[in-house]
Amino acid sequence: MKTLVCFLLLVMTTVVDAEGYKPYKATTPVTGSAGAIGSDTLNNMMALWLETFQKFHPTVKISIEGKGSSTAPPALIEATAQLAPMSRAMKNKELDKFEERYGYPPTQFRVALDALAIFVNKDNPIVGLTLQEADAIFSINRKRSYVENIDDWNKLGIPLGRVSLYGRNSASGTYGFFKKIVLEGGDFKSNVKEQPGSASVVQGVSIDPNGIGYSGIGYITSSIKIVPLGKKEGEYYDTSQENVLNGKYPLGRFLYLYVNKPPNEKLSPVVEEFIRFIFSEEGQHIVDKDGYMRVPASIIEGELDKLN
């Protein structure tokens, strides 16, 4: 997490401006198909990328399946998918399994920035939460050492009654990120209503006056309210791009795409060209459109060099 914040501080002046993002040029038409299996968080963005990509390459077909980031590494290892979108970086054990099979690591691309959001029903009057309080709401362990278990909104001075928890299942990279950063590796409470996707978490909280949940910002709707977060009581920050980049908002993260690229070999034309499109102005505009944040222009050349 510290590494991500330091990196973002170095590039914050470049990401805000679209200058440096090059228009996509389809110099050679490509045909063929590929499969993408992985992150639910990236599911909609993958579909939007494909929709525009097909305007340049009409015969290309890419199947997209978003059942959680943990489904991506096995799919890439077994070659049931050529594109593996993930809302977290691969774990060491996942990288080890890939290398055991192929003798080299998978290639990682950082395709977007996200702010993981904690949200409540739109009528909840809450003004903000510390990470300690969020941990005490969601975790049975309270590794951040908050003074008490928060199972009732009255404990935060909000007259709503029992807290109703919504979250993702363990196949989700968002689940893993939240567990690692907010809960400091602690365990979720057993009464969290686990949902199959981020949209379901948002839907559940939107109709539950006592609800609280989490997801990437791309799934946020007007039916719920994002809770500003902070490390200290009274110092809360929203999910603005500026706050993510300067590290004040504590839950910023990269979104990733992994591929199987043997050293000194080229990817299939469909996969390579699709990745080139993602890092173009058109591709990164779709990131904006889907509610996320584009990657810094300063890193795009380095990401594209991984294709060589």
Q: What is the predicted function of each stretch?
A:
Residues 18-308:
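Flexible loop/hinge segments at secondary-structure junctions
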Residues 4-12:
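Sec-dependent N-terminal signal peptides
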